[in-house]
Regions:
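Accessory nucleic-acid engagement/destabilization modules that flank
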Residues: 1-12, 16-212
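SF2 helicase catalytic motif II
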Residues: 360-364, 374-412
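Walker A/P-loop
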Residues: 244-266
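Interdomain hinge/linker at the junction between the two RecA-like core domains of SF2 helicases
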Residues: 423-485
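Inter-Walker segment of RecA-like/P-loop motor cores
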Residues: 301-368
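Conserved Walker A/P-loop ATP-binding site and its immediately adjacent core
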Residues: 276-300, 325-328, 426
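C-terminal helicase lobe and adjacent C-terminal extensions/tails of nucleic-acid helicase motors
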Residues: 410, 478-487, 493, 498, ...
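Conserved helicase motor
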Residues: 5-10, 322-334, 494-499, 511-531, ...
Length: 769
């Protein structure tokens, strides 16, 4: 009787030899991109060896109620065929043992360790599994011979250098295996779903769209100074794209057109060097929504989008741009057809789309994750162009692991990385101080796209920094409010939610409040309202936390910024006179009446104070000053390896002993240990849309992945101690363990225009954003 790998509800069976052969071939195809197809093929052949067990066969045929573990047998067999003292003997076992449960630790840590799996191997049992005639190819399979990374010219020196990235090579092989396994299983079990994959436009076709779009945009643009500068930046990007793959920096002041210019570079570079896709990683979801719209349609203006769709004049089109972040609801995007929605849902699993717009969290947590679902996409990073937008926002406490993995992607997997920012951080050479330092990107390894960023900064200077209010603390928030009321259109950015709420309460009616106490759906509504008011010349006073700083295309004549790090000040300046319509806008730097939160914010502000003293309060936002700022700032930090990347991954890399799962559990760019998510009640004043039906379903326990995806737009993060307090008061309920929502009987907890309001709970208001 033929052995079965899968069985559908209607009784169709996929034989084990067929599945393992399919997975081996697809897996090896994926790994050809980094010249290790033989490793992938071998892993694919052996990955389901455990399904040859008679007990498992009875289970799949419905003759036995319980299953047995099937992932360990292939791992043990591969290990038994090698010298157990050879570190390379562990490689295939990592892949196979984790192909369902996730990459394991070598030592006991989080879950079953690989060491324990390989310590008790029953050779007669494994040989018995291979007696079936349809597993003959598994018995005859040869152990892989290609060198890691496909480097057949390894010397002792460069092999030692590449060891830093050995874990990444294993992750890439693992990604090939789990994606191939998922895809072949899907193809058999749900062929209709499988048929929706692929069939994207090529990057060459998308470049033609882009060139036509930019030609028309340029032809219709006014002959202003700023548009001429943007055109020059665009041309620099196109010129440098022909150079060799590697690290590049795009150092352009805010408002210089980085979104489109960086894409111009990426498209030209990808076609010149046969890259497969372009990935734009961004720090905030609010920027992603805006950027994804620009790439899909050519604009982020909703009315213009409707017109472009009707006229079939979209830039890359909805089907070719994958927007992947926690707040994106495919089913709620009315612009997308059903087929495109389903196709994009599938593409989030393995990033097969040509253009991907995602978060830093999604990108880097996937690169250090151990779970199969998160790792599927990794092999599609090979031979890609990754644009890191607002690179200064990379969290310093994870910088060591982030720069290490970026170096590995560039050096070993054909990736080109573009570091895109208005405030280029110091990421080259030794970073930090004597007490805490590490080696960043090697000196002179980053190619600047802009030859003279200092001259460009001068050309694009559109604001004056007024430091009159920064020398002494302002007396109180009323003093700040009085200053703001002198202007009809003004943006004020403060440090914390508490400061934002307090200052807003002192402002005239009609002043807009913006903070992360408001759900993403309302923040989008508010940003649209701000743009409408500014566009029509209406009064527009806004009090916001720093979430408005990065990439939100709003243009105020006057901006007030609470004293902060120089990078934050520069980002605030990017919301001022953005289009250069005034001779210059003014950014007022002020010393707030409240204390600056301790930690990175406080340290950044202290470096700025030192620079203000050094430059006699005459602050010019130049690349030279940013370099000085970041160098001093990093020297104040005492930890660049919060996740313990060194001890968990690098310490015993030469022995191939990795704590994959423990690192995965520790790797959270946004610290959720002390915070929880609350789903709130919101009705849009702009569209009339509300989420009552979603909350009702959640309250009734009618939950699935799609419901949580929809609800993500209506969530607010709070400290867990405040969630506990609100639960006691009955203002929050917990319909499912660990899931919190606003009580359906409490209409006052969330208020449009303010967000979550709870006077009895004070501590949550001190959080930034």
């Amino acid at each position: 009787m033929d052995m079965v790998a899968h069985k559908t509800e209607d009784g169709r069976e996929q034989y084990l030899f067929e599945h393992t052969q399919n997975v081996a071939e697809l897996c090896s195809h994926f790994a050809e991109t980094f010249r290790n197809a033989d490793w992938a093929y071998y892993a694919g052949l052996l990955h389901d060896l455990g399904k040859a067990d008679n007990t498992w066969q009875k289970y799949i045929r419905g003759e036995k109620a319980t299953s047995v573990k099937h992932s360990e047998a292939g791992a043990q067999y591969a290990f038994s065929k090698m010298n157990s003292k050879d570190p390379a003997a562990k490689i295939i076992p990592y892949l196979i043992a984790g192909h369902h449960a996730g990459l394991p630790d070598w030592y006991e840590g989080s879950g079953n360790s690989l060491k324990s799996i390989l310590s008790n191997i029953d050779i007669p049992y494994l040989e018995k599994l291979l007696t079936s005639p349809d597993l003959q190819e598994l018995r005859n399979a040869e152990f892989p011979k290609s060198m890691p990374f496909g480097k057949n010219d390894l010397t002792k020196d460069n092999a030692q250098e590449l060891l830093e990235h050995f874990h990444l090579w294993i992750r890439m092989l693992y990604s090939c295996l789990v994606d191939a396994d998922f895809l072949d299983t899907e193809n058999f079990m749900t062929p209709n779903k499988s048929e929706m994959r692929g069939n994207y436009a090529s990057l060459s076709e998308l470049k033609q769209n882009f060139d036509s779009f930019m030609s028309e945009k340029t032809a219709n643009a006014s002959d202003s100074k700023i548009n001429k500068i943007r055109a020059s930046i665009l041309q620099s990007c196109r010129n440098k794209a022909k150079l060799a793959p590697g690290f590049y920096s795009l150092n352009v002041p805010t408002g210089g057109g980085k979104t489109l210019s960086s894409m111009a570079f990426a498209l030209e570079h990808a076609i010149a060097h046969d890259k497969k896709r372009i990935i734009m990683a961004i720090p905030y979801t609010s920027i992603i929504e805006q950027t994804a719209k620009v790439y899909k349609y050519g604009t982020d203006n909703d009315e213009e989008i409707k017109k472009l769709i009707k006229e079939n004049k979209c830039l890359f089109g909805e089907e070719n741009v994958l927007e992947h972040h926690c707040n994106f609801d495919f089913d709620n995007d009315k612009e997308l057809s059903y087929v495109i929605r389903q196709k994009q849902k599938l593409a989030t699993e393995n990033w097969e789309a040509p253009i991907i717009v995602t978060t830093n969290v999604q990108l880097f947590e996937s690169l250090f994750n151990a779970h199969s679902s998160s790792c599927r996409k990794l092999h599609n990073l090979v031979d890609s162009v990754i644009i890191l937008d607002e690179v200064q926002m990379l969290p310093p406490e994870y910088l060591k692991s982030i720069l290490s993995v970026l170096k590995g992607l560039v050096k070993c997997f054909g990736v080109t990385v573009v570091l895109c920012t208005a405030t280029q951080p110091a990421l080259e050479g030794t970073i930090g101080s004597d007490t805490a330092s590490f080696e960043g990107i090697p000196e002179n390894m980053i190619t600047p796209i802009i030859e003279n960023p200092i001259e460009l900064a001068e050309q694009l200077k559109r604001v004056e920094i007024n430091t009159d209010y920064s020398k002494e603390k302002m007396t109180n928030w009323q003093h700040v409010a009085d200053k703001l009321c002198e202007y009809e259109q003004v943006l004020c950015i403060v440090h914390t939610r508490k400061d934002c709420r307090e200052l807003h309460s002192l402002m005239p009616e009609g002043t807009i409040h913006l903070s992360a106490l408001m759900c993403a759906e309302e923040r989008s509504d508010v940003i649209t309202e701000i743009k409408d008011r500014l566009r029509s010349g209406k009064s527009c006073r806004v009090i916001s936390t720093q979430l408005v700083e990065c990439g939100v295309d709003i243009d105020f004549p006057i901006v007030f910024r609470a004293l902060a790090g120089l990078d934050s000040i520069a980002q605030s300046a990017g919301r001022c006179n953005r289009e250069g319509k005034l001779r210059h806008g003014t950014v007022y730097l002020f010393n707030p009446p409240s204390n600056i939160p301790k930690g990175q914010l406080d340290k950044g502000a202290n470096v700025t104070k030192d620079l203000l003293d050094s430059y006699r309060y005459n602050l010019e936002l130049t690349p030279k000053l940013y370099k000085e700022y970041f160098s001093k700032y990093y020297k104040l930090l005492n930890n660049f390896d919060k996740c313990e990347f060194d001890s968990l991954i690098q310490k015993e890399k030469d022995q191939c002993k990795f704590q994959f799962r423990t690192l995965s559990d520790k790797y959270h760019l946004i610290d959720n240990v002390y915070q929880g998510t609350v789903y709130v009640r919101y009705c849009s004043l702009r569209t009339g849309k509300n989420n009552i039906s979603l909350l009702t379903a959640l309250n009734a326990g009618e939950v699935d992945r799609q419901l949580f995806r929809k609800l993500a737009r209506y969530s607010v993060n709070l400290p867990k101690k405040d969630i506990t307090e609100l639960l006691k008061e009955g203002r929050l309920i917990e319909p499912i363990e660990g899931v919190f929502m606003q009580s359906l009987d409490d209409e006052a907890l969330y208020q449009a225009g303010l967000g979550l309001v709870a006077d009895s709970v004070q501590s949550f208001a001190t959080y930034i954003f």
